[in-house]
Design a protein with these regions (language model features):
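A generic alpha-helix surface/boundary motif
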Residues: 39, 94, 137, 167-168, ...
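A bilobed periplasmic-binding-protein/Venus flytrap-type ligand-binding module shared by bacterial periplasmic
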Residues: 64-74, 163-180, 234
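Short, catalytically relevant binding-site loops at active-site mouths
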Residues: 138-139, 158-160, 173-174, 191
């Protein structure tokens, strides 16, 4: 709406994936040109052979967390023994190992319940699972907005060092049209800078694409996302990626 992409000669169309679709597959098969997604699902897709490549980091810290309801009484990792955890197939189980270890537990002490993306909040609210693996600023705020006080265990508090969300594309696009990639990244950076001071106005554009979203709730989430940018990794340049952080991300 602000014309950042248009000024770079890009006619931008945002197309959220349908239920069951994986962003990385859409990019890797050439059906879409750019994607925004979680780093864990990207690493898994990349290792499977999809020709995708990261071009800009969005979140220098990971936002992943175990989220439970206060009423469930899980107030420490040690209390997670026997819990049912809502889990997506694209998640990497090793991400919660340090948290479990801090409570003298391992993966065999909890039950992973595979769920369809989007169903985890309702399942936790209904008591079908004891906790979910999601975003500290995502499902947690959605549950609280619906009247369910939550307790959040961010995995970064347990020493997990990996990236959060990022922007990626097809390997061929970088080779054949590197200028387009540069212009896309440049426009994205400008839009992120503008959005920082215009959160609600920016979220109105998101709601137009995804009308099921609540403007006030999503604006609150976005403000929390911007807190992730206050990171030493970005002291030199916003969106900067380092080999050490990538190595840590891949090792997980």
């Amino acid at each position: 709406a602000q014309g950042f992409y248009e000024k770079e000669g890009i006619d931008l169309e945002i197309r959220p994936p349908a239920a069951g679709q994986q962003n990385e597959v859409l990019i890797g098969t050439g059906k879409e040109q750019f994607g925004v997604g979680n780093i864990d699902s990207f690493v898994k897709a990349k290792s499977s052979g999809l020709p995708i490549v990261s071009v800009m980091m969005d979140q220098p810290d990971n936002p992943f967390a175990v989220v439970t309801l206060v009423k469930n009484g899980i107030d420490s990792p040690a209390k997670m023994k026997g819990m049912k955890l809502a889990w997506f197939q694209t998640n990497v189980p090793a991400m919660i190992d340090p948290m479990l270890k801090s409570g003298n537990l391992s993966r065999k002490d909890i039950e992973f319940v595979s769920v369809a993306r989007g169903s985890e909040v309702q399942m936790l609210a209904a008591g079908q699972v004891d906790a979910l693996f999601g975003f500290a600023y995502g499902q947690a705020l959605t549950l609280e907005a619906r009247g369910f006080p939550v307790r959040v265990f961010p995995i970064r508090d347990y020493g997990v060092r990996l990236y959060g969300t990022h922007i990626y594309t097809h390997e061929d696009l970088i080779k054949k049209n590197p200028d387009l990639v540069k212009r896309f990244v440049r426009a994205t950076l400008k839009s992120l800078i503008w959005t920082h001071g215009n959160v609600e106005e920016a979220m109105k554009e998101v709601v137009k694409v995804s009308p099921d979203r609540d403007l006030k709730l999503e604006s609150r989430k976005l403000r929390m996302i911007y807190d992730f940018y206050n990171n030493g990794d970005y002291a030199t340049r916003f969106g900067l990626m380092t080999n050490d952080k990538w190595a840590s991300t891949i090792d997980i």
